[in-house]
């Protein structure tokens, strides 16, 4: 039997950025190959740092998929743990070490006997930075292993161990990264008429873009437009030639995301024209679509966990956090859910420390659900 604590702590020490998860890939492959040795109903494929493990069913008419992400974040860890990150400036601050450990535990359980239906385990790279699920799908990595149903989880620090939370609709927002540069003409502060101030234009833009949420978005639907970074100018008496802004759009529907992108572009172009500036605008959504659960499958999963002893099933509201599993769920029906890990620190916090008691709980309870799915007639 796998030592879940050791695996989680080993993985926690080697966080890597998306598409650079080389040590993580090697570690996972070693465990997977050990579990699947001499089993003739298992095949393994790799895609860059990603791994696909396909368990062939004895009499399949569908394929069930379980997805986990494997990458870390560019964060300096401050947990003080004995098994803290050994990679400088890298941390598993989003719980992907927990996700991988759960997936390996589920794989071990699933291999105890050949199931009726096919079961695919996806160890997906680059959730945080490059939408690895989209990259794998577009590159044909799944081939004929593409599931008919896809499932996955994400740890949630503000829920306690034993909590499973999801809903029958949108669970995560769709996100879009925004990078914008206004370029004018620099000059001496004493001669503003000889320059063209990009900083003033950026200020007008920041103010006007707030009207997207307040006047263009249906208040029942909601949206977020946040610019967290503005860089312009060099000193107090020089007019800024350029102004760079970096922000994010978050919405609960793809239609609203596209509308928000459209209005942001129109405002930026209008500001640039009115101030006679050059504009460089990049809107990057990629694979970060809203995570939309399939209503019937979500209802089935919720009913299953509602009946499980030791599980507190929560019908939860959507969150404005992003997740690239939304792309795969736009191609394959499925469900994502939150798993409580009871940490006082939020996801992406340098002190985020999940309760490891969630590991055996998740492997037992989710293992039962997967067993039900792959053996139903």
Curated annotation (Swiss-Prot):
Pathway: Amino-acid biosynthesis; L-lysine biosynthesis via DAP pathway; LL-2,6-diaminopimelate from (S)-tetrahydrodipicolinate (acetylase route): step 3/3. It is an enzyme of class 3 (hydrolase). InterPro entries: AcetylDAP_deacetylase, Amidohydrolase, Bact_exopeptidase_dim_dom, Peptidase_M20, Peptidase_M20_dimer. One of its GO terms (biological process) is lysine biosynthetic process via diaminopimelate. One of its GO terms (molecular function) is N-acetyldiaminopimelate deacetylase activity. The active site is at 69, 128 (proton acceptor). It catalyses: N-acetyl-(2S,6S)-2,6-diaminopimelate + H2O = (2S,6S)-2,6-diaminopimelate + acetate. It comes from the Bacteria. Its EC number is 3.5.1.47. The keyword Cell inner membrane does not apply. Keywords: Amino-acid biosynthesis, Diaminopimelate biosynthesis, Hydrolase, Lysine biosynthesis. It holds the Pfam family M20_dimer. CDD domains: M20_Acy1_YkuR-like. Belongs to the peptidase M20A family. N-acetyldiaminopimelate deacetylase subfamily. Catalyzes the conversion of N-acetyl-diaminopimelate to diaminopimelate and acetate. This is N-acetyldiaminopimelate deacetylase.
């Amino acid at each position: 039997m796998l030592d879940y604590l050791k695996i989680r702590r080993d993985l926690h020490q080697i966080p890597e950025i998306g598409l650079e998860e080389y040590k993580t890939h090697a570690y996972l492959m070693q465990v997977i190959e050990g579990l699947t040795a001499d089993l003739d109903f298992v095949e393994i494929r790799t895609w860059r740092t990603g791994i696909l493990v396909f368990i062939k069913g004895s009499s399949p008419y569908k394929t069930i998929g379980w997805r986990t992400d494997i990458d870390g974040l560019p964060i300096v860890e401050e947990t003080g743990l004995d098994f803290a990150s050994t990679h400088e400036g890298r941390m598993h601050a989003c719980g992907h070490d927990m996700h991988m450990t759960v997936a390996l535990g589920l794989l071990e359980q699933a291999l105890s006997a050949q199931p009726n239906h096919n079961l695919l385990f996806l160890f997906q790279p680059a959730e945080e930075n490059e939408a690895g699920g989209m990259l794998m799908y577009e590159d044909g990595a799944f081939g004929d292993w593409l599931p008919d149903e896809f499932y996955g989880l994400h740890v949630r620090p503000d829920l306690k161990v034993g909590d499973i939370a999801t809903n029958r609709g949108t669970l995560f927002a769709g996100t879009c990264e925004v990078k914008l540069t206004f370029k004018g003409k620099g000059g001496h502060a004493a001669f503003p008429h000889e320059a063209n101030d990009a900083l003033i234009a950026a200020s007008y833009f920041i103010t006007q873009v707030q009207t997207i949420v307040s006047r263009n978005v249906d208040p029942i639907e909601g949206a977020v437009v946040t610019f967290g970074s503005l860089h312009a100018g060099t000193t107090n008496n020089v007019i800024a030639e350029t102004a760079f802004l970096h922000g994010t759009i978050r919405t609960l529907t793809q239609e609203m995301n596209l509308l928000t992108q459209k209005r942001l572009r129109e405002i930026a172009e209008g500001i640039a024209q009115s101030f006679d500036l050059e504009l460089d605008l990049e809107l990057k959504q990629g694979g970060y679509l809203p995570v939309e659960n399939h209503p019937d499958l979500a209802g089935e999963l919720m009913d299953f966990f509602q009946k499980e002893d030791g599980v507190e099933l929560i019908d939860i509201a959507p969150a404005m956090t992003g997740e690239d599993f939304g792309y795969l769920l736009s191609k394959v029906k499925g469900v994502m859910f939150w798993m409580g890990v009871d940490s006082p620190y939020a996801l992406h916090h340098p002190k985020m420390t999940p309760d490891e008691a969630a590991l055996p709980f998740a492997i037992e309870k989710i293992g039962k659900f997967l067993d039900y799915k792959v053996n139903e007639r």
